[in-house]
Amino acid sequence: MTNMILLSAVFLSLAILETHCANHISTGISTAGEVEIRCVSDNYVKKIMAYNRDRLSDATISIIQNYKQGPYGCDGVAQSSVISGAAKEKRINTPECITTGRIGGLIVRLKSKPKEEDLGKWECYFTDLTDNVDSKTLTDVLTKYNLPNSGYFNADGTPNDFTTELKVLDYDDVTKDVIMGCKLSTDLGTPPTMSDKQPYRSVHLTGDDRYYAEGDLYSRTSFSSTPYDCTGIPQNTNKYLYNCFNVAPNEYRSAAHRPPPFIALTAPSTPSNIILDNVAEKHAFTKHFFFPAEDKAVVDLRGKNVVISPLAVSDYTQIKMKYLSVQNAVFSPPEELINKLGEVLLKELSTATKFEIVNVDNNFAPTIPGDPYKMVMIADQSCVSGVNKNVIYTGLCKKSSSMSVITMTYFSSLDCDKTSHYAYIFYTGNEPREVEILPAGIQEAVGTPPDVTASNIPENSGGNDCESTTAQDVAEKLFGHLQTVCPTIPLCQMPSTVRTVITDGECAQRPFICNNRALVEYHVPLTELTSGSPFANDWSCTAVDKQSPMKTWHKGLRTELACGLGDLKQKYIDNSLPLIVKQGEDSYKVVCSTPPSLCTDNGLTPPRLNKDDKTYTKEELMAPDDYACTDHFDRVEVKKSYELIQDHFGCEYKLYCKITPHNVRCYITNFPQCQTPAYISGTIGSDTIPNTALTPESLSVMFIKGGLVSTTSLDLSIWTIKGIKLAQFTTAADLPDACELAANNIQVTHNMDFTSAGKTVTFTCINKLPLDNTCDISAGHSKDTRYKLEISNDGSNWVALAESTLAIDGSGVKTLTSTFSKEGGIFAEGDGVFSFLFYSLNDDAIRTMYTDRSNIQARCVKMFDSSSSTSTIKAVDYISYDTYRKSLVPKEPTVTTTTESPPPPTTTTRQIHSKEDFDRVKKELGEKLYHVLFFMGVLTVSVAGGVIILSFIGCLIMRKMEDAPQKTKYSV
């Protein structure tokens, strides 16, 4: 009976685990330029879908906006919105002007793919916001509201005619989204080159009647009393505003006044007073706070670049995260704000990590010491008294992990200052590993902050009372709502490293027809999640013509994290990623699936591989200004639309090559499971890690720039350290370039004698000394001796890299147990000497030390009993990538047959030094006990079941035997 109960409990646990896994699997990360967490197979989307169907009949048709344009922009705004079915109209507080020719759109979410004849029945509607109306035709609406055929007017007040047309643009078999577009066709005399290239855009409607615009319905230009001087276009006329400001070729706007393809940020003279311009600022206080998905924002702060990649989006029934990257920004926030931020973050992070916010020399770069965090901020201090009040967290990881993502949006309180309401955006996470600024003219926006009314503040932002709402109140309210809507969202499955590369050259001046997207790479801390890594890039151009109204040719990858330690699931949206295929020994074939004649108007876009594939030689790929991306690897595997490359150590990398006007640029990224090089996980002395691989002469450290191998300059301030096993160097003469990347005559001290603390040996790189990174353990052992490897660049602040315990039992058997900090390392003991290799996992502290290499030191700390002794040893030497590359030239294999004797038995002693060790052992024992009990239960139930079945069969036989004489008796 006990075993039966046990078995029932086991199966119940498995059922719960299965449900848990299903919930994890249902959490997807959409990587087309944003992170969208949706419980795909749970109640979340179903609930929204049912809500929309109940309220809005069979479909949800979003807004078509209709504005009256003044000569300089928004004089009087007449906006309109349409929702199909019998639903009531909602007032949409959308403050932006839609200039002539702007596009509306819709997304219809149905449970199944609709028929084509059904799609044709929907039209674009224009209604007044003040009246509740059923679905009407365009003519009905215009007649009812006496509209002069449109809401558009010329500068002289005369109306313009327009027509509408509806296009079915796309259908997503996964989300069941029917993406449709409504196009406004005007007779405003658009330039001939633009007449058939008005782009289509679509708009999402979420379940709570708030609109989230995906695409671009809004002007990116701040209008002011001084119009832009558009070459060839009369000033003070709105006739060509749309083309002038947004999609016109270069000949329609002068270089001096051409707006950049970004949302512009105002760059005031005082860096501490950074304001978002009209466009971005007004968005912060509508019911849908967002920056358009394809926008980049760049502001010049006295020569310091601030790069805003697609930013934070929060709609209260969907979690959408976008990221802020800042490089060399200068801020000077008040002490009150810094202190408050520290309090809030410490409270909400709920981790053991000490969060320290520093403000040195006006460089606001708060860090968490010892952990790979960076925090940046855009802030305005006009409402300092409200800083403590209304903070909205759009994403927050509450997890005791070494990596997290925090994105906060702060809305200043209206009562503090009714003329200044600015969004505060924070991002915490690994700093971007590379930021390339798009070489477009950065232009200072002109405009004044809007006078925002209380009705425009998001409902969940805490209202407009400076004294009544705390940050905690708002955060708890928001998180409570999110957890109610989608309780299975594991918030910490957000990327913790966001690498944004704003590509150069591609469609730079065509932001609407050709959307220049950023290459975004996501790395998720996978120690507790999966063995794979989400990777995505979003590099697209949108070609618009009569035949194909809207095509985004590169949507990247849509990835989903599986449950537990399962494999990463990847759904490929299309096949337009560039492929690289190895052909022979000396050439690589680069195949780019790029549509023909895309973004080639006016020669703005470099030629792409449209028709004929080109084969590049290694020399071409390795040309100056290129990134080395080929002969570092043993082989190239083409899997679907990307490349998995395996190096000599079994570590997989992702290779992404982009064709630029002059070269092939390749990005290499390693998967998180390769943060520990694969060969380190083998057994010392085996084929995986031969003893010869651990000789001091064979160990070194090479630098890889955030996973991006470079053959050019080395900037240690932003490079990470990774351990790489080099080829077998036997003498110092084999290392001609060992110090190529180090400063000439750099002096490093080492002391390998524990007994003579004052003895030092200096050497220079010119000496080409062997890489003898060793700890001398020949003098003095106790039964339990511990060694700790540390490095320092000033001789006082030491960072522990690894710790090893050498246990020697009474018979002289040595057992080596090594534990590593987050940098990791490996120790091997032989002839009384420890050889070590260490590497850093993107650690700020280590990287900072290597910024100044004038006096880098490494030391071995020997600890036993109650005393310790320290030996300063030679620090890590440097070797150039070029030398490393040469070492990888394949050699003719030598085939030998050897007979090896079995290795002597080794006694392993488990060392328990901490509660963590004890918990780990306890967990292992518990798992073993679980398996034993499980199989005992299965065995018992099996035996019991067999007995029951046999007993039942026996009973049947007995009954048959008893019945037989009776039948015979009555038959006589």
Curated annotation (Swiss-Prot):
Main localization category: host cell
Transmembrane annotation, as ranges: 933-953
Record topological domains on the Extracellular side: 22-932
Compartment(s) of residence: Host membrane
Signal peptide: 1-21
Membrane-topology descriptor: Single-pass type I membrane protein
Cytoplasmic side: 954-972
GO terms for cellular component: host cell membrane; membrane
Domain of life: Viruses
Span list, region Disordered: 892-912
Protein's UniProt keywords contain Manganese: no
Keywords, alphabetical: Host membrane, Membrane, Signal, Transmembrane, Transmembrane helix
Name of the protein in its database record: Uncharacterized protein ORF41
Species annotation: Ostreid herpesvirus 1 (isolate France) (OsHV-1)
Lineage, highest ranks first: Viruses, Duplodnaviria, Heunggongvirae, Peploviricota, Herviviricetes
